[in-house]
């Protein structure tokens, strides 16, 4: 990630129309992998995650002039990625016929995914995470996989730190219960 000095340079370059393309390319280079994994922890397939990363950066590019720099670039990108991902998940949930078929699809997708390299325990763990409500899953993924601080998550999601801690704690308990029940 960019440090504050680099971020200030990038922000200045974004304001200059002759440097904007290069500055945005730097942003994509710095953040695309983190945004991909953030999204990938929310959606099942590599292709969907890639599409959502592209949608995130397209939306960022289209709105770059409205970015005032009140927050870090990464915070702004995560917010866009979250909105794009949640919209995708809502659309998918409307199209999903049954929960049983979704769980079957999840198992099939993750086991056949060339980008997934986990064992049976990891598959069970991912299945347990997938049962969490979207917002809880989002908080869990940001804290557990991305090792974000509650302050960062709070800024991105616009939720109090106390609520985030409670959500994470409940998510952990649900995951533990699901894993214990499968033994």
Q: In which residue ranges do the predicted regions lie?
A:
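DNA-recognition helix of helix-turn-helix
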Residues: 75, 86, 136, 155-182
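Structural recognition of an alpha-helix C-terminal capping motif at a helix-to-coil junction
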Residues: 51-58, 71-83
């Amino acid at each position: 990630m960019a440090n504050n000095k680099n971020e200030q340079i990038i922000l200045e370059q974004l304001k200059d129309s002759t440097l904007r393309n290069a500055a945005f390319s730097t942003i994509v280079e710095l953040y695309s992998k983190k945004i991909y994994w953030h999204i990938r922890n929310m959606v099942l397939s590599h292709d969907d995650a890639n599409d959502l990363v592209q949608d995130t950066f397209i939306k960022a590019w289209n709105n770059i002039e409205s970015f005032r720099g009140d927050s870090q670039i990464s915070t702004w990108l995560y917010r866009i990625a979250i909105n794009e991902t949640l919209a995708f998940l809502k659309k998918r949930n409307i199209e999903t016929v049954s929960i049983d078929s979704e769980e079957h699809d999840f198992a099939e997708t993750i086991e056949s995914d060339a980008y997934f390299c986990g064992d049976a325990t990891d598959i069970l763990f991912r299945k347990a995470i997938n049962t969490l409500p979207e917002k809880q899953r989002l908080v869990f993924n940001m804290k557990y996989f991305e090792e974000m601080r509650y302050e960062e998550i709070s800024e991105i999601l616009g939720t109090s730190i106390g609520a985030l801690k409670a959500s994470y704690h409940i998510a952990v308990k649900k995951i533990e219960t699901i894993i214990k029940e499968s033994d």
